[in-house]
Amino acid sequence: MSKVIGIDLGTTNSCVAVYERGESKVIPNKEGKNTTPSVVAFTDKGEVLVGDSAKRQAVTNPEKTIYSIKRIMGLMINEDAAKEAKTRLPYHITERNGACAIEIAGKIYTPQEISAKVLMKLKEDAEAFLGESVVDAVITVPAYFNDAQRKATKEAGTIAGLNVLRIINEPTSAALAYGLDKKDSEKIVVYDLGGGTFDVTVLETGDNVVEVLATGGNAFLGGDDFDNKLIDFLANEFKDETGIDLKNDVMALQRLKEAAENAKKELSSANETEINLPFITADASGPKHLVKKLTRAKFEGMIDSLVAETITKINEVVSDAGLKKDEIKEVVMVGGSTRVPLVQEEVKKTFNKDLNKSVNPDEVVAIGAAIQGAVIKGDVKDVLLLDVTPLSLGIETLGGVMTKIIEKGTTIPTKKEQVFSTAEDNQSAVTINVLQGEREFSRDNKSLGNFNLEGIPPAPRGMPQIEVTFDIDANGILTVSAKDKATGKAQEIKITGSSGLSEEEINNMVKDAELHKEEDKKRKEAVDVRNAADSLAHQVEKSLSELGEKVATADKENIQKALDDLRETLKNQNASKEEIESKMKALSEVSHKLAENMYKKDEPNTANDKKKKDDDVIDAEVE
């Protein structure tokens, strides 16, 4: 087996590493640098430039220079993040089959194709360095990338001619690089703030085990957003002074982006910098220049709300791990944006301890990916990497309830099954609506996709057994299947997620679950009691019909009255849980004789057979 390379495919920069002779090391590119800009450019001569050469000509070729492509990877064109990208990026974002794509000189490219060009360069640089062909790779993604984004990343690798052995989470990869040589068990936090994404992960490392305890983040927050705050400030100031909106000029916008990025870097070591952009534009009165002094304090005022979001997420994730901050031994800083002083100050203040800067924030993720590649190949033995799923997964059941099948924080890969049944008599098909989130009701969670299982033989409600299986592989990609146990008919869907989770959706999922915990509980209890009442009424009606004349007239009248009372109460959508339970109790009492007659009618072993058959059936029904 040839060498396995580890790749950190970043929003701003990418890095490749390899494990050989007992250590993981970064592979420099042909230009002699350890990182390669994730930039692709198409020239008028038909050339395709990748990396530094593409970045250098961005100002003169803004509409054909593609950067930050990771921000639209796996997104649909109608998503908020895609709409935001269209206003920020100078190149033409369009759509292909509803998904984001790029149009350059009349040709459509998918984000996978653009990313593949970056991966191809990394592959070629690795082959030149190692002196041999490279095919196998481990590629990292943000922990909060959804299934569509993970799948798109894997597809980019395939397009680049790579056999992607594994997709692993960036903070987990960093922890693998940091914690491999740790003999004593310790709990650490990896704070990963890159160019376009943010993750925070709590892990336990030691004795060659790296276990994720909790993870969280925002797939649309990073250094690009810091730059955008500064771009907005500069453009608005210039407009106030001259009346000219630089955002309408793609070349000026590209110059602003470069200036903002450089100012951000300079303010990491200096208290003040000057942004000087001569001949940024012109009007009837002549050329215009943009000259602006910027202090670190001013810049920090622009980005403090973004940094505060990351601190809030830290608190949530540490809490999810069941830990207190003083139990965290180390805080490892990963990603180029962690060089911003305000970020370091706020994280340090949060944990009240010095930050661990022993790892290179631009290289550690690729180094960890190379280690994981060596583990898969067998060069590194006895190393165990235990990652988790960040949100619960389940399906919609009767009453619009979300029934969880895989709980948040479950170690992956994992496979779990539950058996459900039908909600109506003679129901020939069920719709499986796959959900992600922490709320009790389907409408409050994220729908990842749905599919139908058809051809179920006619049978009374509750009789068919539909086995639903959730299977998450080591790449975090979900496959859901449903099988009718009687006929063996099956249907499955690989969840590719038509859209990513927006910042608002992700933050609100867990927060809303906590805020509405009591409200959700009451609503779920009300749905449960209605389902139970409906089931009882159905069973009593069925028994009355089967027994016919065996039931005394007086008993039948009493049962029918109680049954009608319950049905009437259920028609009232405002009926309380207590009212329904009262009517259920009345029906249960008067139908006691009916139950006795049914019992006498059954053969002795029937009840035991029924119980055995139903042991694995969950008390929930699929609509």
From Swiss-Prot:
Q: Name one GO molecular function term.
A: unfolded protein binding
Q: Which family does it belong to?
A: Belongs to the heat shock protein 70 family.
Q: Which organism is it from?
A: Campylobacter jejuni subsp. doylei (strain ATCC BAA-1458 / RM4099 / 269.97)
List the NCBIfam families hit by this protein, alphabetically: PRK00290.1, PRK05183.1, prok_dnaK
Q: Which InterPro entries match?
A: ATPase_NBD (IPR043129), Chaperone_DnaK (IPR012725), Heat_shock_70_CS (IPR018181), HSP70_C_sf (IPR029048), HSP70_peptide-bd_sf (IPR029047), Hsp_70_fam (IPR013126)
Its induction note reads: By stress conditions e.g. heat shock.
Residues with the modification Phosphothreonine, per the entry, are 197
Q: Which HAMAP family match?
A: DnaK
Q: Which residues form the signal peptide?
A: none
Name it.
Chaperone protein DnaK
In which domain of life is the source organism classified?
Bacteria
Q: What lineage does UniProt assign to this protein's organism? A: Bacteria, Pseudomonadati, Campylobacterota, Epsilonproteobacteria, Campylobacterales
Q: Does the keyword Phosphoprotein apply?
A: yes
- Any one Pfam family here would be HSP70
